[in-house]
Amino acid sequence: VLSSADKANIKATWDKIGGHGGEYGAEALERTFLCFPTTKTYFPHFDLSHGSAQVKAHGKKVADALAVAAAHLDDLPAALSALSDLHAYKLRVDPVNFKLLSHCLLVTLAAHHPAEFTPAVHASLDKFLSSVSTVLTSKYR
């Protein structure tokens, strides 16, 4: 459960990300593909090279979905329902991959905002990404 302090940290972080969401999303995807090569299996039709337009576009989708989630912290299941359906029923993404991408997102955010990435912010973002992952995998059951 996200506390009021967590929610404040999440909203403040998303405000700081601003127009860099797509860039950070793409960087996090690239990190995921490099560190966890099995994640590439879901993107056989993508050019996965550094700076690929397809990775950038998907990174923007990830960032946009997280921005929606950050704006609806009190009702993540409703905010992410369509995305949950897509990943569970059509794409059939292995749930572990959400955790891997979440880790790479945290690394990316820490790399770009080291001063703001305090232990409290880290914990709040980790809880947020875990909550998002839980919602995205909730329809697998």
UniProtKB/Swiss-Prot annotation:
GO terms for biological process: hydrogen peroxide catabolic process. SUPFAM superfamilies: Globin-like. The modification Phosphotyrosine is found at Y24. Pfam families: Globin. Residues 1-141 form the Globin domain. O2 binds at H58. The modification N6-succinyllysine is found at K7, K11, K16, K40. Disulfide bonds: none annotated. Red blood cells. One of its GO terms (molecular function) is peroxidase activity. The modification N6-acetyllysine is found at K16. The modification Phosphoserine is found at S3, S49, S102, S124, S131, S138. Keywords: Acetylation, Heme, Iron, Metal-binding, Oxygen transport, Phosphoprotein, Transport. Belongs to the globin family. Involved in oxygen transport from the lung to the various peripheral tissues. This is Hemoglobin subunit alpha. It comes from Proteles cristata.
